[in-house]
Swiss-Prot record:
Family per record: Belongs to the CbxX/CfxQ family.
Full protein name: Protein CbbX
Xref: Pfam families: AAA, AAA_lid_6
Superkingdom: Bacteria
Subunit structure: Forms homohexameric rings. The oligomeric transition is triggered by ribulose 1,5-biphosphate.
Phylogenetic placement of the source organism: Bacteria, Pseudomonadati, Pseudomonadota, Alphaproteobacteria, Rhodobacterales
Function: ATPase involved in the activation of red-type RuBisCo (ribulose-1,5-bisphosphate carboxylase/oxygenase), which tends to form inactive complexes with its substrate ribulose 1,5-bisphosphate (RuBP). Catalyzes the release of RuBP from inhibited RuBisCo in an ATP-dependent manner. Activation of RuBisCO involves the ATP-dependent carboxylation of the epsilon-amino group of lysine leading to a carbamate structure.
NCBIfam families referenced in this protein's UniProt entry, alphabetically: cbbX_cfxQ
GO-annotated molecular function: ATP binding; ATP hydrolysis activity
Reported impact of R194A: Abolishes ATPase and activase activities
Effect of Y114A: Increases ATPase activity and abolishes activase activity
């Protein structure tokens, strides 16, 4: 506790918030991530908690460093890794961790292939992550109860010990599908008791995915014709209901393939110089050539012509 003779008598939380740099991190989060309001609200709550704890410490009040180990649950492509990176920066700005870096791993980075291999691998990862945030994606793969010779349990035991003993210098975030994470916690109650914050990442709406696509294209100096925009909206609605849909990740992959088609279209049709606008414009056919449309633009036109006869 702070010496009573030197402790201030009041704290301006707004000034603390702006002076810590936390405001910049949260503003970046709002700018860079579309939607995810429930997630952003939880992050702001975490920032408020740490600001109040800092204020209590400065006023000489009893305070306890909160446990901030977390689970992020949601489908792929909903921003879990990006939010973990921002969380690391926020925790550093607010003095919770020393470095504020993110170490992102999966089972393969923690679990060895033979006896005596897992402990050194896990401890090396923890050493790199100390002072920051350790993000374990698809954490449930650490636990394989159907295989008695699996070494994942050894990694789990080491993680649990460090999460308890070093919780003031390391934040562990476990991420994955909600149902699998729930089964994982039921099978490993030690994790459930050490994780105080469970944050759900909702799927993006069609409109949010379209907005995300616009940001991705802007970042690469591309634009779409109005017809291409209509095609992309249709693509999003169809792709959502097909296998292996991964939210923003699927949109990024779709735009990468559209760039390939646009480049091939320009190269094949080119008979002279192309200006910057031509090189930067996505056309309807670049989007509708996707197999998501079951044959692309030509098949749709043929079907429309057949109906018109």
């Amino acid at each position: 506790m702070t010496d009573a003779a030197t402790a201030p008598t009041s704290i301006d939380l707004r000034a603390e918030y702006e002076g810590s740099g936390a405001k910049e991190v949260l503003e970046e989060l709002d700018r860079e991530l579309i939607g995810l309001k429930p997630v952003k609200d939880r992050i702001r709550e975490t920032a408020a908690l740490l600001l109040v704890e800092r204020a209590r410490q400065k006023l000489g009040l009893a305070h306890e460093t909160p446990t901030l180990h977390m689970s992020f649950t949601g489908n792929p492509g909903t921003g879990k890794t990006t939010v973990a990176l921002k969380m690391a920066g926020l925790l550093h700005r607010l003095g919770y961790v020393r470095k504020g870096h993110l170490v992102s791993v999966t089972r393969d980075d923690l679990v060895g292939q033979y006896i005596g291999h897992t402990a050194p691998k896990t401890k090396e990862v923890l050493k790199r992550a100390m002072g920051g945030v350790l993000f374990i994606d698809e954490a449930y793969y650490l636990y394989r109860p159907d295989n008695e010779r699996d070494y994942g349990q050894e990694a789990i035991e080491i993680l649990l010990q460090v999460m308890e003993n070093n919780r003031d210098d390391l934040v562990v975030i476990l991420a994955g599908y909600a149902d699998r994470m729930e089964n994982f916690f039921q099978s490993n109650p030690g994790f459930r008791s050490r994780i105080a914050h469970h944050i759900e990442f909702p799927d993006y709406s069609d409109e949010e995915l379209f907005e995300i696509a616009g940001h991705m294209l802007d970042d690469q100096n591309y634009q779409m014709t109005p017809e291409a925009e209509t095609a992309l909206r249709a693509y999003i609605g169809l792709r959502r209901n097909q296998p292996h849909f991964a939210n923003a990740r699927s949109i990024r992959n779709a735009l990468d393939r559209a760039r390939l088609r646009q480049a091939n279209r320009l190269f094949t049709a080119s008979s002279g110089p192309l200006d910057a606008r031509a090189l930067s414009t996505m056309a309807e056919e670049d989007i509708r050539a996707s197999r998501v449309f079951k044959g692309g633009l030509d098949s749709e036109r043929r079907a429309a012509e057949a109906l018109a006869r």
